[in-house]
């Protein structure tokens, strides 16, 4: 398990673990600057968030951050020298998975002591944090229709229905030209069904063209969906075309509004919270501030009986052994490694993607040398508790505590899978500055550093840069984030909601051949 210090940060550099051969610059460090706490003089101009060799690192020696290997020196590196992609080699190394060897069950709070929020209790017992009506397209050919229906329901037309958060379209770019059987179609249908049945939707329409490969009948049968008072379907070729389907859809939603508006928030346990964990535009401070603080919040949520979904499989690669050791069983740990091997040995072979080493330009500018270092920070969002289950993309999440879902690293695709799996809240950390938002699950964004937070304050919900500023500890920030979970779940608007984001972020994983 990666150990996170509970001390507040002070001084120009940060030592993350006694065994590390690097430290991290908390502020810009100039050439010739003496660092008394580490007994070296800086040989480089080192930007804040970048690594500095704390002692001589010989060629081929592992570079240790949090006592975890994040690369290898490709040359001799003298103490005080900046350590980054120019002198760090990315290569494979043996990792001991030690399945379930560090498993410790979560110390659950008694139900009477658990936190609460104000949520929408659905007929099936699930709890929503928002109250939307959703309109889904089976295929891109019906995308315009579902969007036109949703656009008709302006705030003015919904003013008599104050308990409804809106009518939202979930259109996408696939549904035809793809394999009719196998994983690609199963995955798309699983994603659509997860949205259609999401607790943040009071009701849903599903609209198809009629001749697409993702046939409406096949979708309904595969996912055991049935038309009822809160789920209606239309086929454009049978309804009379574009205009008539839009009109029929509008009338169908109008009929759903009165019942949907009857939904009232009521006090429910925090155990009904399921938080999808995301990071984007990561930087050198992600593993020091926002990610471990979010992890601390998930540890708290887990004690209250809730769930946190870590995802983005390429962004745990290289540190997956720190998760398998915490798995509740060997079988759960092996599920995680099976997904890693699929990515490495089948899906990404020979491709210029980040699981093969190269991170994005923004990550590199932010101080991250390679995918191992990025993964180190990314994995921290899940906290320090046991890994309770591993899910395929968009599978329904039923386990409580810290779980993992196999998704790509691209944020909209990953969050779509999490929401389809049941996430009713998204928590998103960023160092460079992400503008992501989602529906029907609200998204809160956590800044890793104060300068970015102040520059993008309209988009950021909480400033984890205060950890770096030395005013709060990781654990204290984790408690703040947990409290923000509860307020947001109870209806407090996130920054992304205030900006109207989330209408274009439904992006199912397009995994197969397109022809």
What positions do the PLM features span?
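Short secondary-structure boundary segments
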Residues: 430
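Metallocofactor- and cofactor-centric catalytic cores in central/energy metabolism, strongly enriched
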Residues: 2-425, 434, 440-515
